[in-house]
Every structure is written in C-alpha cells, then in structure tokens.
A protein has these predicted regions:
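Mixed-charge, low-complexity intrinsically disordered regions
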Residues: 1-34, 46, 50-123
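Residue-level recognition of beta-strand termini and adjacent short loop/turns
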Residues: 42-43
Length: 123
C-alpha cells in the first residue's frame, strides 16, 4: 500500500497508509491541518496522491467550517476534492476506514488521533 509520512507536532514522523480508492478528508497533526485527496490509478496496491492542501489560519474558511463543535468540508472544498470517490476516515493506527459515498453534510472531518464518534463508532 502507498503511504505518506506526516510530520507530527513533536517533530517525529508518522506513516499514514492511503486507501486504494478515492478519498477526501483532512489530517490533523498537532495544530497543523491538511486537506488530502487521493485516487487509485494503477492497481489495488498503488494509489496516487492528488492533492495535499495545507490549511492555514488565512485560508481555513475556504475549506472547513464548524457546526456544533464538529468540522465539515465547505461546499467549495467538497466540490473541489470529491471526484467519484468515497470518504475514508483516518484511524489511530494510520489506516483508513471506508465510510461510504458522502454527501457534503456527511463529509465530516476525521482528525489525526481521534474521530467524531457519530461517524466512526468503532474508533
């Protein structure tokens, strides 16, 4: 499986396994946030990372909004990143859990290290 290395707030790196089908979501690493989009392009063992967008204080309103303490992708981000894919959530061990074809409202942000329990009750 394809992996990416994410630098954590304490300076160490964590290897994250990418899914083998389309994915859009965000990674939280300490105070750093990234919108990630990838898609399977070669085989079930190779995926191509399409985009990683760093979310900064200056641009975060373009990509995420908060409702009831939960972050969601904005319409702009959802339409930009979602292309015939399915949403995957990041588990604590660095693997992805498929959560199905999302609507924008169900495209809930799953953070690096913890998840929204209503989206991933097994987390």
């Amino acid at each position: 499986m394809e992996t990416i290395k994410i630098k954590q707030a304490n300076g160490s790196e964590k290897t994250v396994i990418l899914p083998v089908r389309g994915m859009v979501g965000t990674l939280h690493v300490g105070s750093d946030r990234y919108v990630v989009c990838c898609k399977a392009v070669i085989s079930n063992k190779k995926v191509r990372l399409m985009n990683i967008y760093d979310i900064t204080e200056d641009n975060k309103d373009q990509y995420i909004y908060e409702k009831n303490g939960v972050e969601y992708l904005t319409d702009e981000a959802f339409n930009k990143f979602m292309r015939d894919g399915e949403l995957y959530s990041l588990r604590k061990n660095g693997t992805w859990r498929e959560v199905g074809i999302p609507t924008r409202e169900s495209c809930c942000i799953v953070t690096f290290g913890y998840a929204n329990p209503h989206l991933d009750p097994d987390f």
